[in-house]
Amino acid sequence: PVSLATLTTGAMPSTHGVIGARWRDYVENDAVELIAGRKGPGPYNLIAPTLAEALLQHEPGAKAVSVATEAMSAVIMAGHGGEAFWLDSARCGWETSPYYAPEVPEWVARSNRERYNLSYITPEWRTLYEKGRYLNTRNWDIVLTGKSRKDKDEPGEGRLKLTSDYDKMLYTPAGNTAVLGFAKQAIAQFKLGDDATPDLLCVCLDASHRISEAYGPESVEVEDMYYRLDRDLADFLTFVFAQVRDGNATVVLT
């Protein structure tokens, strides 16, 4: 969260106050959770304004929406203003917290009732392309196209035990696809970019770093994730420039 806070505030940790996901208070020796508070997940320990906050303060009528797989990422991008949404770890739907809104909008609630996110999850993670396309060779859980699970190159049953739908979203490319899919809905439902007033959409693809941490940067899983992400981003950006007024959108990718 430290680097994300630096990106969204333009400040160093000594200024924005984020030094980790949790730490010890050096006065009381109490454990401090970055986004934990009485109103649910919120930017209680983020002390510098985010870009979203600055936009809302200086541009009346502007809208700012933040979307991520994890609550911490969505909160750090949104800061103290705007809309923030993340995946519910229990049912794998989309949620917010009372800090931002009493409840999610009806279009989000409807998607949750229909369990739409489950459509992104597949029984097993298979490579997008044939084996010869991949430069990396180490694979743990992914199944190469044209092979079955029992023919997997690596022995054993894989490194991760993805038992919950939330884990399957967080540690497979499905998480990125779901986030970008929800971001497209947010653009349409909140009418982002629909007029001359600038709006802001912040998206964090948490599954990317989760997969990299779990399997290693030289794994087939990471390579396949980026192939899929490239395709997902192409689809998302095509939607953005078609949806936004006069195609007038600025994209920052980091």
Report residues per predicted region.
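Acidic helix-start/capping segments at beta-turn-to-alpha-helix junctions
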Residues: 1-5, 72, 252-254
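Short, solvent-exposed loop/turn segments at the edges of secondary structure
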Residues: 1-2, 196, 246
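Stable alpha-helical elements in mature extracytoplasmic
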Residues: 3-4, 47-51, 60, 179, ...
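Conserved beta strand-loop-helix elements of the APE1-like EEP
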Residues: 6-12
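His/Asp/Glu-rich, glycine-adjacent segments
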Residues: 12-197, 206-213
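Alpha-helix capping and helix-loop boundary segments enriched in small/acidic/polar residues
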Residues: 42, 170, 174, 213-227, ...
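Structural motif
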Residues: 200-204, 252
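Metal-dependent active-site segment of extracytoplasmic phospho-/sulfohydrolases and closely related
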Residues: 228-254
